């Protein structure tokens, strides 16, 4: 079931470095929120904070609140593994397990949870591949290695793997940056379908992509080199691209910088 994410006064640090300052925003269920901004502005850092992936970096810490519905994912006693199960991640480059079969790639997360029933695994593999619009392309070669698929197919395989564990939220970090235009179109069409079931947050440098796939857009920027990234503005995507409140947003959208 899709859930809402709320960030309140979030500050992100790596050791003594203040990476992102004072971010407050609401990410609505069954919608796509795009995070945009120049390189180094903190948008990917914010994305990784939403499921505690940044914690793999030594010295990383977060101040403020990140709520999944009403549950603070940083509260004492909250298991990061459980958070990452509820809030899945699709990375910039497709990262299937190359020697593992297509079927086993999809159900890898379920197996880690201890699921061994073959029918459950097979049914989940099929439903997830259908959900990722990949089933018809691979149904006759499920036992072939996932690494043998094209780049676009591999990314959809990674999306199938993410939704197999039934998350509430899907995070996507520039999911089309390494793909050709045809594969990019397939992923964008898939995102539009997936938002009917999931809350989706996507980081993208492609302004046209943000305009096409998202319902709301958040623009991040840096005050200066060495200063923390900040949320400049968040609004409906239509407003951000047609009549933003902040000049910095307009300048970035129009290509004057970034």
Swiss-Prot record:
Topology within the bilayer: Peripheral membrane protein
Residues annotated as domain ABC transporter: 5-247
Enzymatic reactions: phosphate(out) + ATP + H2O = ADP + 2 phosphate(in) + H(+)
CDD domains in UniProt: ABC_PstB_phosphate_transporter
Keyword Signal: no
Enzyme Commission code: 7.3.2.1
Keyword Repeat: no
Keywords, comma-separated and alphabetical: ATP-binding, Cell membrane, Membrane, Nucleotide-binding, Phosphate transport, Translocase, Transport
Molecular function as annotated in GO: ATP binding; ATP hydrolysis activity; ATPase-coupled phosphate ion transmembrane transporter activity
Location in the cell: Cell membrane
Positions of ATP binding: 37-44
GO BP, sorted A to Z: phosphate ion transmembrane transport
SUPFAM superfamilies: P-loop containing nucleoside triphosphate hydrolases
Subunit structure: The complex is composed of two ATP-binding proteins (PstB), two transmembrane proteins (PstC and PstA) and a solute-binding protein (PstS).
Family: Belongs to the ABC transporter superfamily. Phosphate importer (TC 3.A.1.7) family.
Protein name: Phosphate import ATP-binding protein PstB 1
Species this chain originates from: Mycobacterium bovis (strain ATCC BAA-935 / AF2122/97)
Taxonomic path: Bacteria, Bacillati, Actinomycetota, Actinomycetes, Mycobacteriales
């Amino acid at each position: 079931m899709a859930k809402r994410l709320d960030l309140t006064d979030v500050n992100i640090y790596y050791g003594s470095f203040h990476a992102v300052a004072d971010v407050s925003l609401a990410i609505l269920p069954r919608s796509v929120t795009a995070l945009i901004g120049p390189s180094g502005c903190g948008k990917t850092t914010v994305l990784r904070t939403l499921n505690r992936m940044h914690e793999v970096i030594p010295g990383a810490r977060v101040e403020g609140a990140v709520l999944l519905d009403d549950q603070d994912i940083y509260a004492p006693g909250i298991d990061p593994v459980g958070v990452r199960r509820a809030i899945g991640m699709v990375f910039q480059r497709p990262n299937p397990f190359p020697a593992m079969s297509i079927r086993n790639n999809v159900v890898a997360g379920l197996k880690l949870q201890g699921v061994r029933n073959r029918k459950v695994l097979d049914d989940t593999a099929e439903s997830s591949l259908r959900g990722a619009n990949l089933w018809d392309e691979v149904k006759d070669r499920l036992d072939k290695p996932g690494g043998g698929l094209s780049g676009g197919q591999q990314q959809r395989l990674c999306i199938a793997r993410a939704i197999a564990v039934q998350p509430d939220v899907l995070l996507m970090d520039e999911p089309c940056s390494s793909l050709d235009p045809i594969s990019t179109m397939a992923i964008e069409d898939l995102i539009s379908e997936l938002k009917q079931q999931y809350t989706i947050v996507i980081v993208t440098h492609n302004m046209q992509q943000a305009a096409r796939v998202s319902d709301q857009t958040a623009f991040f920027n840096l005050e200066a080199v060495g200063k923390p990234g900040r949320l400049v503005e968040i609004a409906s995507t239509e407003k951000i691209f047609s009549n933003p409140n902040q000049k910095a947003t307009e300048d970035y959208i129009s290509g004057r910088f970034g």
